[in-house]
Amino acid sequence: MARRCQFENSNDIGVFCKLTSAYCLVSVGASENFYSVFESELVPHIPVIHTSIGGTRIVGRVTCGNKNGLLVPNTCNDNELRNIRNSLPDNVRVRRIEEKLSALGNCVVANDYVALIHPDLDRESEEIIADTLGVEVFRTTIANNVLVGTYCVINNRGGLVHPLASVEELDELANLLQIPLCAGTINRGSDVIGAGLVVNDWAAFCGLDTTSTEISVVENIFKLNEMKDENMDNEMRKDFVMNLE
């Protein structure tokens, strides 16, 4: 299911949060309403961690991660890093990365198996991304844009990319990622998809301006309703087993 929300009158919620299937980072200083939208969907399945990164609130643009790990820029201070580490599941690796392109969320898009990265990221950074996130890494662009994390959002089931991506490009990217992709928009026609949308394998959050048609595309390409049905089946199965006992 996809939920609409705003961060202090901004529809670019992906700037202020990072969502994976193992954790969610949200910026400090938001309204209780913003937090409650996330916590009502995610808790107790995964932790929702309130934090800043390097004293800034743009946690979604300066971090990248998946269920296996989290990468933060070298501007992340010791207190922030300690708070994040203490709040994450024990099996999630956390690492600071020295990279001149420090807006990692703009330069990297990843699911639990594959990452697409900015063509100019350091080789050492590429290796750290592969090791920490446990993914195969590919350097690429999307619709001639090097900021792949800005113009693409993926989970393990599908992905939404810049509306000007060609059919050939979609096929090539889908082959790299091994998931279906579609070109589209968020927030009533915005092509800055990474800023307006965050997803994991069962939930999505988007800006308040997102239209019903855009939400329908999101729920279909990321197969959110299928996951919801699977979760309901699992809950019914558990109840059945408990009744037998």
UniProtKB/Swiss-Prot annotation:
Keyword annotations from UniProtKB, A to Z: Cytoplasm, Initiation factor, Nucleus, Protein biosynthesis, Ribosome biogenesis
GO biological process: cytosolic ribosome assembly; ribosomal large subunit biogenesis
GO molecular function, one term: ribosomal large subunit binding
Subcellular location(s) of the protein: Cytoplasm; Nucleus, Nucleolus
Cellular compartments per GO CC: cytoplasm; nucleolus
Predominant subcellular localization, coarse grouping: cytoplasm
Subunit description: Monomer. Associates with the 60S ribosomal subunit.
Record family assignment: Belongs to the eIF-6 family.
Name of this protein: Eukaryotic translation initiation factor 6
Chain's gene name: EIF6
